[in-house]
């Protein structure tokens, strides 16, 4: 079985997996941390420039842009909020992978959760899936990968994809 298939099957089964309460607790803490980084980061130049680049697409959609609360498409909200959450470098870190998982994972999950009206538990399960997949990938890629690439950007894609696939019910 390929690694991609194994991670896909893991995400597909995430809704049925028994998750201990302390894992949900850590997913909630990661989400709070994400908001604490994203709201002030949204006031900084990188997020403002990203917003300006997409301003023609703002106003239609169900996904929220922080900190002001405008609505847009899930793609735009994930990009703008992801930029904001990583701007101040106060976002969470997975030290073993030299990686900030919250920025890509929670930005994608929140954008899709807004647009798809998912439960809080479904949201948290998506966050857990994204962290699990991306942290495992980051663990095997560093430190050599970090010599040339920013792990949050390269590995974050996998976490955001895993979490998004769970939110959307993809396999």
Regions found by a protein language model. Give the residues of each.
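N-terminal core-entry segment
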Residues: 1-171
